[in-house]
């Protein structure tokens, strides 16, 4: 594991500045709460970025120096720059970890990476949620209790239009009867992706120790470490082999294709 993991927390930071009620829950923004809670872990270097920053705070320099990107978004999904979303996708394919929280299921980077609508059932009704750990030996479940109970949360329900997860770590039950795949792992290219469901902006979810533990575990799991990047495109043989073009004109050796 890397001695220090560079973590960037991206948050729209809109609800907290436009709603007094939500601003009272997260006076320093959702990103500020997550940063504060993660600061107890001494192996994280934490940076924050928000929608209103230039390039949404995700410049090439920031992205290239980010090991794991955490994303929380809701009301500005469509307004996020297509160019920035594509850059995030490419960085994940190149090895950067990506953690999508709650309504980030509908974010541009997440949908680009998963290739589906990522739509779901939902209801805002202050209902109880119980998040069950179904893979207790997985690194993301390390030091996490058998279940996490939230007295009030936004309800999500199946069907969740996502590809079948490579690994499913958590499943949620809601007071109104819905169930939901609430902790999903994916591999895309050289990068790892984790989706975690809890975290509606009206509730102090991100101040909880157990939620912070899940996020910290996901950072450690998703962090690229010791990746030997494969050589792609045309390569010379490792062993001595016959040259099928020997004696032919050099122009015959050239092929037009996407490298």
Where are these regions (language model features)?
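Aromatic-Pro/Gly-enriched surface loop or interdomain linker
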Residues: 1-65, 233-259
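Extracellular ligand-binding/catalytic regions of CAZymes and related secreted enzymes
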Residues: 2-4, 124, 188-194, 198-259
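Solvent-exposed loop/turn segments at secondary-structure junctions
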Residues: 13-15, 53, 75-78, 104-109, ...
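Short, solvent-exposed loop/turn elements at domain surfaces
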Residues: 15-19, 178, 204-205
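Catalytic beta-strand/loop cores that center a nucleophilic Ser/Cys/Thr
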Residues: 44-45, 64, 120-197, 232, ...
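Hydrophobic residues in well-ordered beta-strands that form the structural core
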Residues: 48, 100-101, 195
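Structural motif
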Residues: 68-72, 195
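A glycine-rich, often tryptophan-bearing local segment used as a flexible ligand/cofactor-contacting loop or short
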Residues: 76-143
